Amino acid sequence: MDIIKYDVYRGPNIGIFTSVNDKFVFVPNGFAKTKAENLAHYLQTEYLMTPVANTRLLGILMVLNNHGILLPRTSSPEEITNLRKCTDLNVKILDTKYNALGNLISVNDKGGIVSPIIEKEYVKEIEDVL
Protein backbone atom coordinates (compact mmCIF):
# COMPACT_ATOMS: atom_id res chain seq x y z
CA MET A 1 0.00 0.00 0.00
CA ASP A 2 1.29 3.44 -0.93
CA ILE A 3 0.68 6.37 1.40
CA ILE A 4 0.73 10.01 0.35
CA LYS A 5 0.54 13.21 2.34
CA TYR A 6 -2.57 15.16 1.45
CA ASP A 7 -4.22 18.25 2.87
CA VAL A 8 -7.87 19.22 2.87
CA TYR A 9 -8.71 22.92 2.90
CA ARG A 10 -5.00 23.58 3.49
CA GLY A 11 -5.16 21.86 6.86
CA PRO A 12 -3.95 18.55 8.28
CA ASN A 13 -7.34 17.25 9.47
CA ILE A 14 -8.32 15.07 6.53
CA GLY A 15 -10.59 12.79 8.55
CA ILE A 16 -12.94 15.62 9.44
CA PHE A 17 -13.93 16.34 5.86
CA THR A 18 -13.64 13.07 3.92
CA SER A 19 -14.83 9.48 4.20
CA VAL A 20 -13.74 6.50 2.11
CA ASN A 21 -14.65 2.92 1.30
CA ASP A 22 -13.30 0.64 -1.43
CA LYS A 23 -15.46 2.20 -4.15
CA PHE A 24 -15.94 5.87 -3.20
CA VAL A 25 -14.19 8.80 -1.63
CA PHE A 26 -16.80 11.20 -0.28
CA VAL A 27 -15.80 14.86 -0.30
CA PRO A 28 -17.79 17.92 0.72
CA ASN A 29 -19.63 20.17 -1.70
CA GLY A 30 -17.34 22.97 -2.79
CA PHE A 31 -14.24 20.78 -2.64
CA ALA A 32 -11.94 21.57 -5.56
CA LYS A 33 -12.85 19.29 -8.44
CA THR A 34 -9.23 18.73 -9.46
CA LYS A 35 -8.30 17.77 -5.88
CA ALA A 36 -11.28 15.38 -5.73
CA GLU A 37 -10.27 13.83 -9.05
CA ASN A 38 -6.66 13.46 -7.92
CA LEU A 39 -7.69 11.91 -4.62
CA ALA A 40 -10.07 9.48 -6.32
CA HIS A 41 -7.40 8.55 -8.86
CA TYR A 42 -4.85 7.88 -6.15
CA LEU A 43 -7.29 5.79 -4.08
CA GLN A 44 -8.60 4.06 -7.23
CA THR A 45 -12.17 5.05 -6.41
CA GLU A 46 -14.87 7.33 -7.69
CA TYR A 47 -15.41 10.62 -5.89
CA LEU A 48 -18.76 11.88 -4.77
CA MET A 49 -19.39 15.43 -3.60
CA THR A 50 -22.08 15.65 -0.96
CA PRO A 51 -22.95 17.50 2.20
CA VAL A 52 -23.95 15.65 5.35
CA ALA A 53 -26.41 17.49 7.58
CA ASN A 54 -25.81 20.49 5.32
CA THR A 55 -22.15 20.67 6.42
CA ARG A 56 -18.69 19.79 5.12
CA LEU A 57 -18.01 17.53 8.12
CA LEU A 58 -18.42 14.20 6.33
CA GLY A 59 -15.84 12.24 8.29
CA ILE A 60 -17.30 13.29 11.62
CA LEU A 61 -20.96 12.77 10.76
CA MET A 62 -21.13 9.69 8.51
CA VAL A 63 -19.96 6.13 8.97
CA LEU A 64 -19.67 3.69 6.10
CA ASN A 65 -18.19 0.53 4.74
CA ASN A 66 -18.68 -1.32 1.45
CA HIS A 67 -22.24 -2.32 2.40
CA GLY A 68 -23.85 0.84 3.71
CA ILE A 69 -23.83 4.38 5.01
CA LEU A 70 -25.24 5.61 8.29
CA LEU A 71 -26.13 9.27 8.60
CA PRO A 72 -27.23 11.40 11.54
CA ARG A 73 -30.86 12.39 11.88
CA THR A 74 -29.89 15.96 10.97
CA SER A 75 -29.27 14.83 7.37
CA SER A 76 -31.69 16.12 4.79
CA PRO A 77 -33.97 13.94 2.65
CA GLU A 78 -32.16 15.29 -0.43
CA GLU A 79 -28.80 14.11 0.91
CA ILE A 80 -30.19 10.64 1.56
CA THR A 81 -31.82 10.43 -1.86
CA ASN A 82 -28.64 11.59 -3.59
CA LEU A 83 -26.45 9.05 -1.77
CA ARG A 84 -28.89 6.24 -2.60
CA LYS A 85 -29.02 7.32 -6.24
CA CYS A 86 -25.25 7.73 -6.68
CA THR A 87 -24.11 4.61 -4.82
CA ASP A 88 -25.26 1.03 -4.59
CA LEU A 89 -25.06 1.23 -0.80
CA ASN A 90 -27.70 0.81 1.88
CA VAL A 91 -28.20 4.39 3.17
CA LYS A 92 -30.03 4.90 6.45
CA ILE A 93 -30.53 7.45 9.20
CA LEU A 94 -29.48 6.34 12.68
CA ASP A 95 -32.08 8.11 14.80
CA THR A 96 -29.92 8.43 17.90
CA LYS A 97 -29.52 11.68 19.82
CA TYR A 98 -25.85 11.74 18.78
CA ASN A 99 -24.86 13.13 15.41
CA ALA A 100 -21.07 12.59 15.22
CA LEU A 101 -21.47 9.00 14.03
CA GLY A 102 -18.02 8.92 12.43
CA ASN A 103 -16.52 9.63 15.84
CA LEU A 104 -18.65 7.04 17.66
CA ILE A 105 -18.70 4.08 15.27
CA SER A 106 -15.77 2.45 13.49
CA VAL A 107 -16.38 -0.41 11.05
CA ASN A 108 -15.00 -2.40 8.20
CA ASP A 109 -16.78 -5.14 6.24
CA LYS A 110 -16.10 -7.79 8.88
CA GLY A 111 -17.05 -6.04 12.11
CA GLY A 112 -16.98 -2.87 14.08
CA ILE A 113 -16.79 -1.10 17.38
CA VAL A 114 -19.38 1.25 18.83
CA SER A 115 -18.94 3.80 21.57
CA PRO A 116 -20.63 2.82 24.83
CA ILE A 117 -22.69 6.02 24.69
CA ILE A 118 -24.63 4.70 21.68
CA GLU A 119 -27.91 3.29 22.96
CA LYS A 120 -28.16 -0.52 22.84
CA GLU A 121 -31.27 -0.48 20.67
CA TYR A 122 -29.23 0.97 17.78
CA VAL A 123 -26.54 -1.73 17.69
CA LYS A 124 -28.70 -4.19 15.69
CA GLU A 125 -29.62 -1.43 13.23
CA ILE A 126 -25.93 -0.59 12.77
CA GLU A 127 -25.21 -4.29 12.10
CA ASP A 128 -28.07 -4.52 9.60
CA VAL A 129 -27.07 -1.45 7.59
CA LEU A 130 -23.33 -1.96 7.62
Residues of each region from the PLM?
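The feature marks the mature, well-folded catalytic cores of soluble enzymes
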Residues: M1-L130
